[in-house]
Amino acid sequence: MSEKTEQPTEKKLRDGRKEGQVVKSIEITSLFQLIALYLYFHFFTEKMILILIESITFTLQLVNKPFSYALTQLSHALIESLTSALLFLGAGVIVATVGSVFLQVGVVIASKAIGFKSEHINPVSNFKQIFSLHSVVELCKSSLKVIMLSLIFAFFFYYYASTFRALPYCGLACGVLVVSSLIKWLWVGVMVFYIVVGILDYSFQYYKIRKDLKMSKDDVKQEHKDLEGDPQMKTRRREMQSEIQSGSLAQSVKQSVAVVRNPTHIAVCLGYHPTDMPIPRVLEKGSDAQANYIVNIAERNCIPVVENVELARSLFFEVERGDKIPETLFEPVAALLRMVMKIDYAHSTETP
Protein backbone atom coordinates (compact mmCIF):
# COMPACT_ATOMS: atom_id res chain seq x y z
CA MET A 1 0.00 0.00 0.00
CA SER A 2 1.43 3.39 -1.02
CA GLU A 3 2.45 5.75 1.73
CA LYS A 4 0.24 8.81 2.03
CA THR A 5 2.73 11.66 1.61
CA GLU A 6 0.82 14.02 -0.71
CA GLN A 7 -1.21 16.97 0.57
CA PRO A 8 -4.97 16.62 -0.04
CA THR A 9 -6.33 18.09 -3.26
CA GLU A 10 -9.28 20.49 -3.36
CA LYS A 11 -11.57 17.61 -4.33
CA LYS A 12 -10.32 15.54 -1.40
CA LEU A 13 -10.96 18.45 0.96
CA ARG A 14 -14.48 18.91 -0.44
CA ASP A 15 -15.20 15.19 -0.03
CA GLY A 16 -13.87 15.40 3.53
CA ARG A 17 -16.29 18.24 4.32
CA LYS A 18 -19.18 16.09 3.08
CA GLU A 19 -18.09 13.42 5.56
CA GLY A 20 -17.85 15.93 8.41
CA GLN A 21 -14.04 16.18 8.38
CA VAL A 22 -13.79 19.92 9.00
CA VAL A 23 -11.49 22.03 11.15
CA LYS A 24 -13.46 22.86 14.28
CA SER A 25 -12.42 23.57 17.86
CA ILE A 26 -14.82 23.05 20.77
CA GLU A 27 -12.64 25.43 22.79
CA ILE A 28 -13.45 28.32 20.44
CA THR A 29 -17.15 27.51 20.83
CA SER A 30 -16.71 27.58 24.62
CA LEU A 31 -14.94 30.95 24.30
CA PHE A 32 -17.87 32.44 22.36
CA GLN A 33 -20.29 31.12 24.99
CA LEU A 34 -18.21 32.68 27.78
CA ILE A 35 -18.19 36.02 25.94
CA ALA A 36 -21.98 35.83 25.51
CA LEU A 37 -22.45 35.16 29.24
CA TYR A 38 -20.07 37.99 30.15
CA LEU A 39 -21.94 40.47 27.94
CA TYR A 40 -25.28 39.31 29.31
CA PHE A 41 -24.31 39.82 32.95
CA HIS A 42 -22.53 43.08 32.09
CA PHE A 43 -25.64 44.64 30.55
CA PHE A 44 -28.44 42.91 32.49
CA THR A 45 -27.09 42.71 36.05
CA GLU A 46 -29.09 45.76 37.20
CA LYS A 47 -32.27 44.34 35.69
CA MET A 48 -31.69 41.01 37.46
CA ILE A 49 -31.16 42.80 40.78
CA LEU A 50 -34.41 44.74 40.28
CA ILE A 51 -36.24 41.49 39.50
CA LEU A 52 -34.79 39.93 42.67
CA ILE A 53 -35.83 42.92 44.80
CA GLU A 54 -39.34 42.90 43.30
CA SER A 55 -39.63 39.16 43.98
CA ILE A 56 -38.59 39.58 47.63
CA THR A 57 -40.99 42.53 48.08
CA PHE A 58 -43.84 40.61 46.46
CA THR A 59 -43.13 37.59 48.69
CA LEU A 60 -43.30 39.74 51.83
CA GLN A 61 -46.65 41.14 50.68
CA LEU A 62 -48.04 37.60 50.53
CA VAL A 63 -47.07 36.64 54.10
CA ASN A 64 -50.56 37.25 55.53
CA LYS A 65 -52.41 35.76 52.55
CA PRO A 66 -53.83 32.21 52.43
CA PHE A 67 -51.15 29.65 51.60
CA SER A 68 -52.73 28.30 48.38
CA TYR A 69 -53.36 31.81 47.06
CA ALA A 70 -49.85 32.98 48.00
CA LEU A 71 -48.26 29.91 46.41
CA THR A 72 -50.18 30.43 43.14
CA GLN A 73 -49.35 34.13 42.94
CA LEU A 74 -45.70 33.59 43.83
CA SER A 75 -45.33 30.78 41.27
CA HIS A 76 -46.78 32.94 38.50
CA ALA A 77 -44.53 35.86 39.45
CA LEU A 78 -41.40 33.69 39.55
CA ILE A 79 -42.18 32.05 36.20
CA GLU A 80 -42.75 35.46 34.60
CA SER A 81 -39.55 36.90 36.10
CA LEU A 82 -37.36 33.91 35.23
CA THR A 83 -38.75 33.73 31.68
CA SER A 84 -37.92 37.36 30.96
CA ALA A 85 -34.49 37.05 32.61
CA LEU A 86 -33.44 33.79 30.98
CA LEU A 87 -34.90 34.43 27.52
CA PHE A 88 -32.08 36.76 26.47
CA LEU A 89 -29.50 34.53 28.18
CA GLY A 90 -30.59 31.44 26.26
CA ALA A 91 -30.84 33.35 22.98
CA GLY A 92 -27.37 34.83 23.48
CA VAL A 93 -25.76 31.45 24.18
CA ILE A 94 -27.48 29.85 21.16
CA VAL A 95 -26.41 32.68 18.83
CA ALA A 96 -22.84 32.49 20.18
CA THR A 97 -22.70 28.71 19.68
CA VAL A 98 -24.12 28.75 16.15
CA GLY A 99 -22.01 31.78 15.22
CA SER A 100 -18.77 30.18 16.42
CA VAL A 101 -19.42 27.00 14.44
CA PHE A 102 -20.37 28.99 11.33
CA LEU A 103 -17.23 31.14 11.53
CA GLN A 104 -15.06 28.03 11.80
CA VAL A 105 -16.57 25.74 9.16
CA GLY A 106 -19.22 27.72 7.27
CA VAL A 107 -22.30 25.87 6.04
CA VAL A 108 -21.64 22.13 5.94
CA ILE A 109 -24.22 19.47 5.11
CA ALA A 110 -22.35 16.33 6.12
CA SER A 111 -24.95 13.68 5.30
CA LYS A 112 -22.34 10.91 5.33
CA ALA A 113 -21.34 11.79 8.89
CA ILE A 114 -24.93 11.27 10.11
CA GLY A 115 -25.30 7.77 8.72
CA PHE A 116 -24.65 4.57 10.66
CA LYS A 117 -21.09 3.26 10.63
CA SER A 118 -20.25 -0.26 11.80
CA GLU A 119 -16.89 0.82 13.23
CA HIS A 120 -18.76 2.83 15.88
CA ILE A 121 -19.75 -0.45 17.56
CA ASN A 122 -16.56 -2.31 16.73
CA PRO A 123 -14.74 -2.96 20.06
CA VAL A 124 -11.33 -3.25 18.37
CA SER A 125 -11.80 0.07 16.57
CA ASN A 126 -13.04 1.75 19.75
CA PHE A 127 -10.10 0.35 21.73
CA LYS A 128 -7.67 1.81 19.19
CA GLN A 129 -9.40 5.19 19.43
CA ILE A 130 -8.86 5.24 23.20
CA PHE A 131 -5.09 5.19 22.68
CA SER A 132 -5.03 7.32 19.52
CA LEU A 133 -3.12 10.59 19.18
CA HIS A 134 -6.39 12.52 19.33
CA SER A 135 -7.35 10.90 22.65
CA VAL A 136 -3.93 11.58 24.16
CA VAL A 137 -4.09 15.23 23.07
CA GLU A 138 -7.62 15.58 24.49
CA LEU A 139 -6.46 14.09 27.81
CA CYS A 140 -3.47 16.45 27.97
CA LYS A 141 -5.70 19.38 27.02
CA SER A 142 -8.25 18.56 29.75
CA SER A 143 -5.51 18.19 32.36
CA LEU A 144 -3.93 21.47 31.28
CA LYS A 145 -7.30 23.24 31.49
CA VAL A 146 -7.90 21.99 35.04
CA ILE A 147 -4.40 23.04 36.16
CA MET A 148 -4.45 26.46 34.49
CA LEU A 149 -8.00 27.32 35.60
CA SER A 150 -7.08 26.34 39.16
CA LEU A 151 -4.03 28.61 38.99
CA ILE A 152 -6.14 31.49 37.64
CA PHE A 153 -8.66 31.11 40.48
CA ALA A 154 -5.89 30.77 43.07
CA PHE A 155 -4.14 33.90 41.77
CA PHE A 156 -7.23 36.10 41.97
CA PHE A 157 -8.29 34.79 45.39
CA TYR A 158 -4.76 35.43 46.66
CA TYR A 159 -4.81 38.91 45.12
CA TYR A 160 -8.15 39.71 46.84
CA ALA A 161 -7.23 38.04 50.17
CA SER A 162 -6.47 41.32 51.99
CA THR A 163 -9.72 42.81 50.65
CA PHE A 164 -11.71 39.82 51.94
CA ARG A 165 -10.26 40.32 55.42
CA ALA A 166 -11.61 43.88 55.41
CA LEU A 167 -15.13 42.90 54.31
CA PRO A 168 -16.58 42.67 57.88
CA TYR A 169 -15.81 46.39 58.28
CA CYS A 170 -16.90 47.35 54.76
CA GLY A 171 -20.68 47.01 54.74
CA LEU A 172 -23.10 45.27 52.38
CA ALA A 173 -22.80 47.68 49.44
CA CYS A 174 -19.02 47.56 49.58
CA GLY A 175 -19.06 43.76 49.82
CA VAL A 176 -21.24 43.49 46.71
CA LEU A 177 -18.80 45.68 44.76
CA VAL A 178 -15.80 43.60 45.87
CA VAL A 179 -17.43 40.28 44.98
CA SER A 180 -18.68 41.58 41.61
CA SER A 181 -15.19 42.91 40.81
CA LEU A 182 -13.65 39.53 41.67
CA ILE A 183 -16.16 37.66 39.51
CA LYS A 184 -15.57 40.04 36.60
CA TRP A 185 -11.78 39.61 36.67
CA LEU A 186 -12.09 35.85 37.12
CA TRP A 187 -14.30 35.76 34.04
CA VAL A 188 -11.87 37.90 32.02
CA GLY A 189 -8.97 35.66 33.07
CA VAL A 190 -10.85 32.55 31.99
CA MET A 191 -11.73 34.13 28.62
CA VAL A 192 -8.09 35.08 27.97
CA PHE A 193 -7.06 31.53 28.81
CA TYR A 194 -9.66 30.13 26.40
CA ILE A 195 -8.38 32.42 23.63
CA VAL A 196 -4.93 30.83 23.97
CA VAL A 197 -6.33 27.29 24.25
CA GLY A 198 -8.68 27.90 21.31
CA ILE A 199 -5.84 29.02 19.02
CA LEU A 200 -3.70 26.02 19.98
CA ASP A 201 -6.59 23.56 19.65
CA TYR A 202 -7.68 24.97 16.27
CA SER A 203 -4.10 24.67 15.00
CA PHE A 204 -3.96 21.04 16.13
CA GLN A 205 -7.33 20.24 14.56
CA TYR A 206 -6.14 21.81 11.28
CA TYR A 207 -2.97 19.69 11.37
CA LYS A 208 -4.93 16.53 12.21
CA ILE A 209 -7.52 16.99 9.45
CA ARG A 210 -4.84 17.67 6.83
CA LYS A 211 -2.90 14.62 8.06
CA ASP A 212 -5.98 12.37 7.96
CA LEU A 213 -6.81 13.51 4.42
CA LYS A 214 -3.32 13.04 3.00
CA MET A 215 -3.15 11.05 -0.23
CA SER A 216 -0.72 8.63 -1.78
CA LYS A 217 0.75 9.28 -5.22
CA ASP A 218 -1.53 6.56 -6.58
CA ASP A 219 -4.57 8.34 -5.08
CA VAL A 220 -3.58 11.58 -6.81
CA LYS A 221 -3.11 9.80 -10.14
CA GLN A 222 -6.46 8.02 -9.77
CA GLU A 223 -8.21 11.29 -9.00
CA HIS A 224 -6.78 12.85 -12.13
CA LYS A 225 -7.93 9.84 -14.15
CA ASP A 226 -11.43 10.19 -12.70
CA LEU A 227 -11.49 13.86 -13.60
CA GLU A 228 -10.33 13.07 -17.12
CA GLY A 229 -13.37 10.85 -17.55
CA ASP A 230 -15.73 13.67 -16.58
CA PRO A 231 -17.80 15.08 -19.51
CA GLN A 232 -16.75 18.62 -18.61
CA MET A 233 -13.11 17.57 -18.78
CA LYS A 234 -13.67 15.97 -22.18
CA THR A 235 -15.24 19.21 -23.39
CA ARG A 236 -12.30 21.13 -22.00
CA ARG A 237 -9.87 18.80 -23.81
CA ARG A 238 -11.63 19.50 -27.10
CA GLU A 239 -11.39 23.23 -26.38
CA MET A 240 -7.71 22.77 -25.55
CA GLN A 241 -7.09 21.03 -28.87
CA SER A 242 -8.77 23.92 -30.66
CA GLU A 243 -6.60 26.38 -28.74
CA ILE A 244 -3.47 24.45 -29.72
CA GLN A 245 -4.50 24.39 -33.35
CA SER A 246 -5.31 28.11 -33.37
CA GLY A 247 -2.09 28.97 -31.57
CA SER A 248 -3.78 30.88 -28.70
CA LEU A 249 -2.40 28.54 -26.04
CA ALA A 250 1.16 28.85 -27.32
CA GLN A 251 0.76 32.63 -27.48
CA SER A 252 -0.39 32.75 -23.84
CA VAL A 253 2.59 30.64 -22.76
CA LYS A 254 5.02 32.91 -24.63
CA GLN A 255 3.55 35.98 -22.91
CA SER A 256 4.06 34.54 -19.41
CA VAL A 257 6.98 35.46 -17.16
CA ALA A 258 7.07 32.06 -15.45
CA VAL A 259 5.44 28.64 -15.49
CA VAL A 260 4.64 26.97 -12.16
CA ARG A 261 4.18 23.23 -12.19
CA ASN A 262 3.80 20.24 -9.99
CA PRO A 263 6.18 17.56 -11.30
CA THR A 264 3.95 15.82 -13.84
CA HIS A 265 0.27 16.76 -13.60
CA ILE A 266 -0.19 20.55 -13.51
CA ALA A 267 1.32 23.61 -15.21
CA VAL A 268 0.21 27.23 -14.72
CA CYS A 269 1.44 30.25 -16.73
CA LEU A 270 1.81 33.48 -14.77
CA GLY A 271 1.68 36.88 -16.45
CA TYR A 272 3.09 40.02 -14.83
CA HIS A 273 4.22 43.51 -15.87
CA PRO A 274 4.95 46.43 -13.49
CA THR A 275 2.71 48.84 -15.44
CA ASP A 276 0.46 46.86 -17.79
CA MET A 277 -0.25 44.00 -15.39
CA PRO A 278 0.73 45.05 -11.84
CA ILE A 279 -1.28 42.22 -10.28
CA PRO A 280 -0.17 38.82 -11.64
CA ARG A 281 -2.70 36.82 -13.65
CA VAL A 282 -3.09 33.20 -14.67
CA LEU A 283 -2.69 33.39 -18.45
CA GLU A 284 -3.01 29.67 -19.08
CA LYS A 285 -3.16 26.41 -17.17
CA GLY A 286 -3.35 22.74 -17.97
CA SER A 287 -3.08 19.23 -16.60
CA ASP A 288 -1.38 16.03 -17.79
CA ALA A 289 -0.79 16.20 -21.59
CA GLN A 290 -1.64 19.89 -21.75
CA ALA A 291 0.72 20.57 -18.84
CA ASN A 292 3.57 18.83 -20.67
CA TYR A 293 2.77 20.84 -23.81
CA ILE A 294 2.90 24.12 -21.83
CA VAL A 295 6.23 23.17 -20.22
CA ASN A 296 7.73 22.25 -23.61
CA ILE A 297 6.71 25.60 -25.13
CA ALA A 298 8.09 27.46 -22.10
CA GLU A 299 11.42 25.65 -22.26
CA ARG A 300 11.75 26.28 -26.00
CA ASN A 301 11.14 29.99 -25.42
CA CYS A 302 13.49 30.24 -22.39
CA ILE A 303 10.63 30.99 -20.00
CA PRO A 304 11.50 29.92 -16.42
CA VAL A 305 9.72 26.76 -15.28
CA VAL A 306 9.51 26.51 -11.49
CA GLU A 307 8.44 23.39 -9.60
CA ASN A 308 6.21 24.29 -6.63
CA VAL A 309 3.59 21.67 -5.80
CA GLU A 310 1.51 23.69 -3.32
CA LEU A 311 1.45 26.88 -5.38
CA ALA A 312 0.74 25.03 -8.64
CA ARG A 313 -2.26 23.26 -7.10
CA SER A 314 -3.61 26.43 -5.51
CA LEU A 315 -3.36 28.41 -8.75
CA PHE A 316 -4.82 25.56 -10.82
CA PHE A 317 -7.87 24.91 -8.64
CA GLU A 318 -8.57 28.42 -7.29
CA VAL A 319 -7.90 30.78 -10.23
CA GLU A 320 -9.55 30.75 -13.65
CA ARG A 321 -7.75 31.60 -16.89
CA GLY A 322 -7.32 35.34 -17.29
CA ASP A 323 -8.15 36.08 -13.64
CA LYS A 324 -5.96 37.93 -11.18
CA ILE A 325 -4.46 35.89 -8.38
CA PRO A 326 -6.31 36.23 -5.03
CA GLU A 327 -4.80 38.01 -2.04
CA THR A 328 -4.17 34.69 -0.28
CA LEU A 329 -1.60 33.83 -2.97
CA PHE A 330 0.12 37.24 -3.18
CA GLU A 331 3.01 36.27 -0.93
CA PRO A 332 4.05 32.94 -2.57
CA VAL A 333 3.59 34.36 -6.09
CA ALA A 334 5.61 37.48 -5.20
CA ALA A 335 8.40 35.28 -3.82
CA LEU A 336 8.41 33.22 -7.01
CA LEU A 337 8.51 36.32 -9.24
CA ARG A 338 11.37 37.79 -7.22
CA MET A 339 13.32 34.57 -7.67
CA VAL A 340 12.63 34.53 -11.44
CA MET A 341 13.70 38.17 -11.80
CA LYS A 342 16.94 37.49 -9.92
CA ILE A 343 17.69 34.59 -12.27
CA ASP A 344 16.96 36.77 -15.33
CA TYR A 345 19.17 39.54 -13.94
CA ALA A 346 22.01 37.10 -13.26
CA HIS A 347 21.78 35.73 -16.80
CA SER A 348 21.72 39.22 -18.32
CA THR A 349 24.85 40.28 -16.40
CA GLU A 350 26.68 37.12 -17.42
CA THR A 351 25.87 37.62 -21.12
CA PRO A 352 28.67 39.70 -22.81
UniProtKB/Swiss-Prot annotation:
Annotated membrane topology is: Multi-pass membrane protein
- Record has Transport as a keyword: yes
Cite the InterPro entries for this sequence. Answer: BsaZ-like (IPR006307), T3SS_substrate_exporter (IPR006135), T3SS_substrate_exporter_C (IPR029025)
A GO biological process held by the record: protein secretion
Decide whether keyword Cell membrane is in the record.
Answer: yes
Q: Can you list the GO cellular component terms from the UniProt entry?
A: plasma membrane
Where it sits in the cell: the answer is: Cell membrane
Instruction: State the source organism's domain of life.
Output: Bacteria
Keyword tags: Cell membrane, Membrane, Protein transport, Transmembrane, Transmembrane helix, Transport
The UniProt transmembrane annotation reads 34-54, 89-109, 144-164, 176-196
Entry-linked NCBIfam families: FlhB_rel_III, PRK12721.1
Role? Part of a type III secretion system.
Q: Which PANTHER family match?
A: FLAGELLAR BIOSYNTHETIC PROTEIN FLHB, SECRETION SYSTEM APPARATUS PROTEIN SSAU
Q: Which family does it belong to?
A: Belongs to the type III secretion exporter family.
Q: What is this protein called?
A: Secretion system apparatus protein SsaU
Species the sequence originates in: Salmonella typhimurium (strain LT2 / SGSC1412 / ATCC 700720)
**GN (gene name):** ssaU
